[in-house]
Amino acid sequence: MTPIARIAAFASLSIFGVLPVHAQQDPPITIDTHVDIPFSYMHDPKFDAGKDTPLLVDLGKMERGGLNAAFFVVWVPQHKLDAAGYAKAVAQGEQKYDAIGRLLLQYPDRIRLATTPEQLVANHKAGLLSAVIEIENGYSLGHDIHRLDAAFDRGARSIGLAHVGNNDLCTSSLPDTKHGEPAMNSTGDTGMSDFGRAVIKRANQLGMLVDVSHSSDACVREALKLSTAPVYASHSGARAVLDHPRNLPDDLLRAIADKGGVVDAVAYKEFLKHDPGREAAEKKLQNAIAKQRGEKEYDSDKDDYLPAMDAGMAEIQKKYPLATLDDYMDHIQHMVKIAGIDHVGIASDFDGGGGITGWANASETRNVTAALRKRGFSEADIAKLWGGNLLRVWREVGRDAEH
């Protein structure tokens, strides 16, 4: 039995604990729907999430910050659409599943797998954190629909169709135009493939959330037409607030809401605030670090946590301040205005580029709640944003399942 399979069985057990000290002022439950993990997660001692780590999300930071649950991401980068590329993607995905399994097996007294909304809520009531497994980039299925069933059996409950660069499911909001991929919304943007359509159909049957973050506008529109259940965007912003292709336009915010879904606003600096000076300075720093390490290009999985990177980013911050919680609130308020309070949620993209002034890591999660209150959101609204909406959508997706 695999680590994830053992954990899936273990997750149904109940342990009764004490609610956090801050329970009275915290929302009923807080869920961050996008947290990345490095490939060496739970293998390299410095990425042992049960200890104090350089990661933006570890168990201690979640506990101190009042973050009750996180969608931990099985992400793989985009390679070629050939047998070698698919094999590499499948192998890289296995690394992530194994890492999450190690986390859950090593710290069952602190965090449990949640494969249903009910398990997530039960974990919280028992004083435990929850891990939900989320696939980012359906390319890791290796162009084999049966791997979606295998992922479900291992605990995955969300399938992100695309990432950066077009894959075999659909076109991306950030295609690889340098290597000839057509720009989003151009005549060459083909949207969904037959394999992508099959993945959505099977995800509906299994009761998996269909995640359209990173997908092209055309892909999102077709996903909305094809899916028999609500769809969601695990980590996206509002294009009307910042014109970035990774952000969703108002018509798609409305369409996802009309389908009964939810869009989780992402706290990723470049999707919140345009700062060409900072972006150029960061790129220069990355190139310098790659050169120092003898690498052809910067490897965020290895290099993001180097002392030299920390020092360099501190200098950049002095000249080019990060996006702030106020910038983040601007996106949330616009998304609520367009989609409605029942169709917006919260995501950090921590350890995948996320992190802003005021919400720099999971230990600062309560700052988000305070900022929402400052913007005039009621306690009932905050409860919806922090997890109520996501749990509703997840339940609806499960009810529509045929497995």
Residue spans for each PLM region:
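Bacterial N-terminal signal peptides that target proteins for export
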Residues: 1-9
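Bacterial N-terminal signal peptides
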Residues: 8-20
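Serine/proline-rich low-complexity intrinsically disordered segments, especially terminal tails, linkers
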Residues: 14-16, 116, 218
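N-terminal hydrophobic targeting/anchoring segments and the immediately downstream early-domain regions
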Residues: 22-185, 243-403
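Divalent metal-binding pocket/active-site signature
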Residues: 142, 153-232, 237-246
